[in-house]
Amino acid sequence: PFKFVERIQQDRIVLEKFADYYDADRIKIERVTYRPIPDTTVRLANLQSGELDMVERIAATDVGTVNQTDGLSLQEVVGLGYMAIYANIGNGDRALTPMGEDARVRQAFSLAIDREALNQVVFDGTARAGNQPFPPTSQWYNQDLPVPARDVEAAKALLAEAGQERVAVEIQHANNPVVTQMMQVVQAMVAEAGFDVTLRATEFATLLSEQTAGNFQLSRSDWSGRPDPDGNLHQFVTCEGGINDPKYCNPEVDRLLNEARAVTDPAARKALYDEAGVILNQDLPVIYLGHQTYIFALDDKVQGFKALPDGMIRLQDVTLAE
């Protein structure tokens, strides 16, 4: 609904209304300026001063400040995607570890994590704890696979069953403050169960290329999510999946997810995803940690905006009061 006007590197992108857009009557704003501001404190300060009308995805730690500021409001929505740790199961020599070779070790690692505590410490309780590719708000969420409570003794028992007392493992993660804090909390939690974790921070683009190349043992990454459940699963966990970086392969999972692609009845599809989810919850090529909440902060003069779970900003029917 908008057309490009100008781009000033590291400063702004300016768009203006495209009059020939098919739905142009619903676009009430003539001009939009997007400003990249990496620092969350600076973003909030600009909103408070009136320099900005809206901030996309404020820090969870700033929610209280916004709530206490006259003239500002919040909109929050749980995203479609997930936060997770990918386990290298078959992608080269770095898969040849207890973590990569034995699902019991991965199960022990998962059981040693208190997902709700992780949410409270890192996200001030604004995220959702999770253990599936779908958030609890999704129709595809399997109610029969609730988030497991942390159980250090059960984790130790699984390690012993796998013939392990302590397991050394490296987790690579993006070098941003929130993810770093998250992994430090996980590192401390799983240590109590017998995991000696080394953290390796890297640029996100490098992290993705390392995943593809198999140069990882565990890798912490996010997925933004898709409205259709296929987009959160098939490409990640089928044998020939395009971004199946762990190189996990289970023919039964392939069968179920391929069949789900061909079924149109939602209830029948959900039954297939539920069945695949049970297997994935045992094999754990992906250790799901939770689901981010998209938090938008707005000046009260912005009216008609609605936060949506894909995190996209849509300006149909949005107005700016004088």
Identify the function of each model-found stretch.
Residues 292:
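Short beta-strand/turn segments that mark the catalytic/cofactor-handling region
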Residues 124-144, 295-297:
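Mature extracytoplasmic/periplasmic domains
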Residues 2-5, 126-127, 302:
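Short glycine-aromatic motifs
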Residues 133-134, 231-234, 300-303:
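Short aromatic-enriched loop/helix-cap "lid" or pocket-rim segments at secondary-structure transitions
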Residues 289:
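Active-site-proximal polar cores
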Residues 1-122, 138-283, 320-322:
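Extracytoplasmic/periplasmic ligand-capture domains
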